């Protein structure tokens, strides 16, 4: 069985026009940024299959010839750069036709399933829509949701290849596993500080899962987080205890801190301005400055943002300063998690062999 990437076409490999959502002319054909370099990096490890919904293909509203011309040029362009696709699987039906082959249904991939043609543990669906995520779930494999800003092709390749980003290779890989069980939560956290990859995060709080993924993605490491908490009450215990377990796991994985950079500072500028300063000092402290207008973002209470970072800092024994300004609460919270991830990436990087302290101990 071969590791396979089942890749969406419109909005993932090529730009999808927001006017009519059809690529029916050469003028509309535009590759997504960095898709060719990423696929070239991935092709030695994965087979590529395109899986695409094309609403009304072959009808007067979307003639087959209008589809074929830009599609064939796209395929020729990929092939000219050394990228080939084993198959191109297309559902031509509209949603109201209720067919069996339209994503997220799996009829298009029936032969892959019946003949065991893909490695379930090492195959992925890559796409920009929720239907792609549901397709992966129906196939029993993992998914990566493409987004040109938040999860672009560079990051996808980094995740799938699990590239070493923080360790020069002269030390054993830095790994830790923490299991934390209380009457309120049952948590398992695993962190691999010296490899990037696909993170498996399930806490039952969707927005929180996304924020934790931001830490690992921008921190350049891989982690798994599984949490079963008393969400019938609220998400407080889940967020707090996950922070405590994650902080403990990071502390254990970092080890005695010999050779690490220790400090990190980042000031990313987007529509929000987020500042983060971190010292893996062994002395826990936090200064947090953020104001939120909304009580919740999705299923996540905004007041828990500060509590998460406070619990994390004290569990890691780290000094942490966070500040954010902006107008959109979703973006402000996300920028804090991203900034922390980028700062942590600097602090855990191995630079030598010395203890980064005049005291000789941290």
UniProtKB/Swiss-Prot annotation:
It catalyses: D-erythro-1-(imidazol-4-yl)glycerol 3-phosphate = 3-(imidazol-4-yl)-2-oxopropyl phosphate + H2O; L-histidinol phosphate + H2O = L-histidinol + phosphate. CDD domains: HAD_HisB-N (cd07503), IGPD (cd07914). GO terms for cellular component: cytoplasm. Its cofactor is Mg(2+); Zn(2+). It comes from the Bacteria. The active site is at residues 8, 10. GO terms for molecular function: histidinol-phosphatase activity; imidazoleglycerol-phosphate dehydratase activity; metal ion binding. It is found in: Cytoplasm. Disulfide bonds: none annotated. SUPFAM superfamilies: HAD-like, Ribosomal protein S5 domain 2-like. GO terms for biological process: L-histidine biosynthetic process. InterPro entries: HAD-like_sf, HAD-SF_hydro_IIIA, HAD_sf, His_synth_bifunc_HisB, HisB_N, Histidinol-phos, IGPD_sf, ImidazoleglycerolP_deHydtase. Residues 1-173 are annotated as: Histidinol-phosphatase. The keyword DNA-binding does not apply. Pathway: Amino-acid biosynthesis; L-histidine biosynthesis; L-histidine from 5-phospho-alpha-D-ribose 1-diphosphate: step 6/9; Amino-acid biosynthesis; L-histidine biosynthesis; L-histidine from 5-phospho-alpha-D-ribose 1-diphosphate: step 8/9. Keywords: Amino-acid biosynthesis, Cytoplasm, Histidine biosynthesis, Hydrolase, Lyase, Magnesium, Metal-binding, Multifunctional enzyme, Zinc. HAMAP family: Bifunc_HisB, HisB. In the N-terminal section; belongs to the histidinol-phosphatase family. This is Histidine biosynthesis bifunctional protein HisB.
């Amino acid at each position: 069985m071969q590791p396979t990437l089942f890749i969406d076409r419109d909005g993932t490999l090529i730009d999808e026009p927001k006017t009519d959502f059809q690529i029916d002319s050469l003028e509309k054909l535009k590759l997504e940024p960095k898709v060719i370099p990423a696929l070239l990096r991935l092709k030695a490890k994965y087979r590529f299959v395109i899986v695409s919904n094309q609403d009304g293909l072959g009808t007067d509203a979307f003639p087959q010839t209008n589809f074929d011309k830009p599609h064939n040029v796209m395929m020729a362009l990929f092939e000219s750069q050394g990228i080939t696709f084993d198959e191109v699987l297309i559902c031509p039906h509209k949603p109201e036709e209720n067919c069996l082959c339209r994503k997220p249904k799996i009829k298009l991939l029936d032969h892959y399933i019946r003949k065991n043609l893909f490695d379930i543990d090492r195959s992925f669906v890559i796409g920009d829509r929720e239907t792609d995520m549901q397709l992966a779930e129906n196939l029993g494999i993992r998914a990566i949701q493409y987004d040109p800003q938040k999860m672009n092709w560079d990051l996808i390749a980094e995740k799938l290849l699990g590239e070493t980003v923080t360790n020069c290779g002269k030390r054993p890989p830095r790994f830790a596993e923490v299991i934390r069980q209380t009457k309120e939560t049952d948590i398992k956290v695993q962190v691999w500080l010296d490899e990037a990859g696909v993170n498996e995060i399930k806490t039952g709080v969707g927005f929180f899962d996304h924020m934790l993924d931001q830490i690992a993605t921008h921190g350049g490491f891989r982690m798994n987080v599984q949490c079963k908490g008393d969400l019938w009450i609220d998400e407080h215990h889940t967020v707090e205890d996950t922070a405590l377990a994650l902080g403990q796991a990071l502390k254990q994985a970092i080890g005695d801190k010999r050779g690490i950079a220790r400090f990190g500072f980042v000031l990313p500028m987007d529509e929000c301005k987020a500042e983060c300063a971190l010292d893996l000092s062994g002395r826990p402290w936090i200064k947090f400055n953020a104001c939120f207008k909304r009580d919740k973002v999705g299923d996540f209470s905004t007041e828990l943002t500060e509590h998460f970072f406070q619990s994390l800092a004290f569990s890691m024994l780290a000094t942490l300063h966070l500040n954010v300004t902006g107008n959109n609460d979703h973006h402000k919270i996300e920028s804090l998690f991203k900034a922390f991830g980028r700062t942590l990436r600097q602090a855990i990087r191995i630079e030598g062999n010395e203890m980064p302290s005049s005291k000789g101990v941290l």
